[in-house]
Design a protein with these regions (language model features):
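Conserved catalytic cores of phosphodiester-cleaving nucleases, focusing on short active-site segments
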Residues: 59-61, 69-75
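Residue-level detector of short, conserved catalytic/binding motifs and their immediate flanks
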Residues: 55-57, 69, 139
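Basic, amphipathic N-terminal segments that precede the first structured/catalytic domain
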Residues: 2-57, 191-198
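Short Lys/Arg-rich amphipathic alpha-helical segments
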Residues: 53-56, 93, 101-104, 151-154
Length: 198
């Protein structure tokens, strides 16, 4: 039986609570959270510097010492109709979902080794690996996608198609809880979090 950590929550450098990503402020406002901005973390950069391209999700977090969260944020508000955005959104979101799935895959691949060489967040990454290996625990993957949308109905239909695509691409993860939400709905799936547009 693996012992949960009790000492690292208060002094880990992972214990910051306020992050900005794509013009959105994420406030993880409970001591139950331990979160890192993984795409900027040394653990990810060590791999991505050595091997391009290696991708990462925006946030990697543990809630209440027992639930692992991978969160990717895409804010296309004001840019939904740009050529570059349209390219990513085409084919019913196929390319966007592929990119998000790759970030999930690469994050899990790099995080497995992080516990070996991460000096400042070793306990954090060790706990993440324990959670990854515990098949009683679901890995929560949240894609937070913000768009300029014509109608609510169209938006819901699109999200449901995207969700199926993302689930297919991450089916190998087995016990994963996958959701795609706009900002306004994100607190329903991300506990103890306050999210605001900057």
């Amino acid at each position: 039986n693996m012992q949960p950590f009790t000492t690292w929550n208060n002094n880990s450098s992972a214990n910051m609570s306020n992050f900005q990503e794509s013009g959105i402020n994420f406030k993880f406002q409970s001591p139950k959270w331990n979160v890192v901005k993984y795409d900027e973390h040394l653990a990810h950069k060590k791999v991505s510097n050595a091997l391009q391209p290696t991708k990462a999700v925006d946030f990697l977090g543990i809630h209440d010492n027992r639930q692992l969260f991978l969160v990717e944020v895409k804010n296309y508000r004001g840019h939904t109709h740009d050529a570059e955005t349209q390219e990513v959104l085409q084919a019913k979101g196929e390319e966007l979902m592929r990119r998000i799935a790759v970030k999930g895959r690469d994050t899990i691949a790099t995080v497995t080794n992080s516990a070996r060489f991460s000096t400042n967040d070793e306990d954090f990454f060790t706990r993440i690996n324990q959670l990854l290996l515990d098949n009683q625990k679901k890995i929560v993957i949240i894609a937070c996608i913000e768009l300029d949308i014509a109608g609510e109905k169209e938006h819901k239909a699109r999200m449901s198609v995207w969700m199926q695509k993302l689930k297919q691409k991450l089916a190998w993860l087995h016990a994963a809880k996958i959701s795609i939400n706009p900002i306004e709905n994100i607190s329903a799936v991300l506990p103890d979090t306050e999210i605001l547009f900057v």
